[in-house]
Each structure stands twice: as structure tokens, then as C-alpha cells.
Amino acid sequence: MASKSRHYLNQPWYIILFIFVLSLIAGTLLSSVYYVLAPIQQQAAEFDRNQQMLMAAQVISSDNTFQVYEKGDWHPALYNTKKQLLEISSTPPKVTVTTLSSYFQNFVRVLLTDTQGNLSSFEDHNLNLEEFLSQPTPVIHGLALYVVYAILHNDAASSKLSASQVAKNPTAIESIVLPIEGFGLWGPIYGFLALEKDGNTVLGTSWYQHGETPGLGANIANPQWQKNFRGKKVFLVSASGETDFAKTTLGLEVIKGSVSAALGDSPKAASSIDGISGATLTCNGVTESFSHSLAPYRALLTFFANSKPSGESHDH
């Protein structure tokens, strides 16, 4: 009797229906999981990207704690959420999503520049950051626009400035961070290069996305190797010791071998970095990435290089 009542189990239509229903349920479950996890993944990616940016600017150390520059040196710091300021601390806590987000909101301004070195804000052009980054470089009044991340001075007055105010009068800028992108051995590489207010001296660099070989090319993301960039100059110094910001080579070269052994104290050494053993092609890609990515910023970097220490209005 039971066998007769279940005769349909072997019917083709039942098997097809069963597979369809099972697939529908599985698809619904997977979609639900993706819907729930997508915002979390996006938040994690944003945290990592912003963390890497601030590591390049030395605001966050390789130990994932805040740092603050005072009295001519970097000191371990904590982010005081009440005062919303960095304060020197002998036992700084690890950076969290909350503290990084608060610091970013108060002391990082996302600006725009063009090939003439003019600074502006997204609000000035009625542009949205997310849409801007997902589309080809927009052109306003015949000039392409490029992103600049401005790190502001660690004081209450600077934290209250809008992006438009900073763009019009950049005296509150402590350092700038530029997005760097190019191709390594196995695919695209994305990172940041942070420069001091002089527009020439490197604070640091970081790479937040790459597909290079672990133990070889992947060492571009190793903090120990990245320390080699500190203090380097993006504008090549001439043999006479002078720098022609309008014409000289702009970029950083990762050479094969050691800079001290290959270049000694020659002017080129100031813009060169020790290579990574066994990763020559990746290093060549990094060199090309700096050259290509920095080119549109020459006028802006020249402006900062020629600015007086006291600062001046960016209206030219």
C-alpha cells in the first residue's frame, strides 16, 4: 500500500520539482546571508582602507595604535573620545572601528585637485565620494579632478573646519595622502603615499590590496620594508642640490639591490628605495605606480613645496 502511495517519488516531474524547490530554498538562504553580511564586509573593507591610509601618514603605528607628532617626534597616543583629540599615552589602546571612524570624521578631509593645483571640495562641485570613486575621472571646466586626503592638525579648531574651508585655506593641513594604483606581477595594486606639508618628503606608504606572491612581491605590504620610504623625496634632486619642481622627475624608484651600495650619497639616492629580493617585477610595478599616480598632482605638490611655513591661501 505504501509503495503505491509513493509511486510518484520516481516520477521525472517529482524529481525536477524537488530539485527546483531545493535550489530555491538554498538560493534564498544564500541571498539572505549575503544581504546580512554585505554591510559588515563593506565596513571591514572601509576600516582596513582607512587604517592603511592613516598608517601611511604615521597617525597609526604598525602595532595598530595611534601616534601623535609633538616636540619633533612621534609618540604613542590614545584618542580621547570626549575631547576628540589625540593625547600622548604610555599605554595606548588598539585602534577600533569607533575610534578610527571618529578620528577620520574630525581630522581627515577628502578634497579634490586638478592638474593646475587648485584645491576644492566635493561639496563645491556637488559630487558624491562613492560615485566619484566608482566612475572615470570627471572633468570640471576642462580639467580632470583627482582625490587628495588632507590630514589636519591635532587641535579642536582644525577639527571644526569643513572640507571647503580647508580647500580655500589649507593652513590646517598637517600632511596629505595620495591614492596610488598600478599593476604588480599578478594584477592591480592599490595603496597610499603620505607626504609632509612640504609636498615632497615621504611620511610613509601602504598597500591595502594586491595579489602578489607571499614571501616575495607581497612584501610590499610589510611594514619593515615600508619603513625604507620614510624621509625620501618624490621630486628628484639635481646634481647641484637644487630641485626644479616644474621639470624634474616626479616619483619614487624601487631599485634592484641596496640604495647605499648602488647609489651611495648621490642625489638620486634620496628618491630611491631598496628592492625586494626575488620580486623585481613587482618592484618595477611599484615604481611605475608611483610615477603614473603622482603625475597629475605635480602642480599641487609644487604649491605645497613653495608655500611658506606659516601657510597661505590656496587661490591661484
Swiss-Prot record:
Stated name of the protein: Na(+)-translocating NADH-quinone reductase subunit C
Self-association state and partner proteins as the record states: Composed of six subunits; NqrA, NqrB, NqrC, NqrD, NqrE and NqrF.
Transmembrane segments: 13-33
Cofactor(s) demanded: FMN
Family annotation (InterPro entries): FMN-bd, NqrC
Gene encoding the protein: nqrC
GO BP terms, alphabetized: sodium ion transport
GO molecular function, one term: oxidoreductase activity, acting on NAD(P)H, quinone or similar compound as acceptor
Organism encoding this protein: Chlamydia trachomatis serovar D (strain ATCC VR-885 / DSM 19411 / UW-3/Cx)
Native organism taxonomy: Bacteria, Pseudomonadati, Chlamydiota, Chlamydiia, Chlamydiales
Record family assignment: Belongs to the NqrC family.
Catalytically driven reaction(s): a ubiquinone + n Na(+)(in) + NADH + H(+) = a ubiquinol + n Na(+)(out) + NAD(+)
The UniProt record lists the keyword Nucleotide-binding: no
Gene Ontology CC annotation, any one: plasma membrane
Membrane topology: Single-pass membrane protein
Functional description taken from the UniProt entry: NQR complex catalyzes the reduction of ubiquinone-1 to ubiquinol by two successive reactions, coupled with the transport of Na(+) ions from the cytoplasm to the periplasm. NqrA to NqrE are probably involved in the second step, the conversion of ubisemiquinone to ubiquinol.
